[in-house]
Amino acid sequence: MLHHVRPYGHGAFVPNRLLEVTPQFLDAALARATSLGFQFASLDQVVAHVRARGDGPPQLAVTFDDGYVDNLEHALPVLRRHGVPATVFVTPGFADRTSTLWWLDLEHAIAASPEVVVDLGTGEERLPCAGDAQRSAAFERIYWSLRSGPEARLRSTIALLAARAGIDTQATVARLCLDWAGLARLAADPLVSIGAHTMTHPMLAKHDAAVVRSEMAQSRDVIVERLGVPVRHLAYPVGDPGSAGSREFAMAAEL
C-alpha cells in the first residue's frame, strides 16, 4: 500500500515522509519482488486466487491511497515499465476539493510558524517551532494527541492552526490530488483499477454506523458515476485499529 511516488524532497522536517517513496525505489521494489518469485496481480485476481485456494507463485497486489497527482505522473510510468497492475483508492472529497489533507496541513502550519498555540483538551499550550527538532516535537505532540480523540476536534484544531499560519488548505489539495479529469486519465490505463476510499477520508471507527455506511456507499456510487468504472474494493482511511475494525469490515462486506 503506497501513497506518494515522487522525487525525493530535501528537508529535515518532513514528518509525513513515511507516506512517500521515490520512483527509483518503486522501480527497484517491483524488480526485486519479481526476482523473488512474486507474481503481480490485480486485487480481483488476488481475491479469486485466495478463494480458489490456488497454487502457483505467491501473488502481490500494488495499491495507492487517496489519488495523488504523482500517481499519474511518476508511479504509472514505472508500473507500465514492469507491466504491473495497481488499484488506486479514490476519495471523492479530494477530487472535488471539498476535503482537506489535514496531516499535511498540520505539517505546513508548524513549518510556517515560530510557535504554535494549541488547546489539546487541557488548556492552551505554547509549542516552540524555531528549529527542526522543535518542529518535530510539536508535530508529534499535536498529531498523536488529536489522533486519540474525536475526529471533529482534530479537524477543527488543525484548520485553526493552518488558518493562523496562512496556509491555504484547499490549494494543498488542488496541488497534490488529481481532479476528476486526472482520475479519468489514470483509470483509462488498462493496468489501473479504481477502488473507493470513502467520501471525506474519516477515521471510520470514530463515527456512528449511519455515517460509516454513507461514507462507504456514497464514495463507491460517486466514483462509478464520475468515472464510469466498476468499484469492487474499499480501503479504510488511516487503517489502524483505531480507525477501522470488525464493525467497519462487516459493513463493507454488506455493501
Language model feature labels by segment:
Residues 1-233, 240-255:
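Catalytic alpha-helical scaffold of carbohydrate-active enzymes acting on polysaccharides/glycoconjugates
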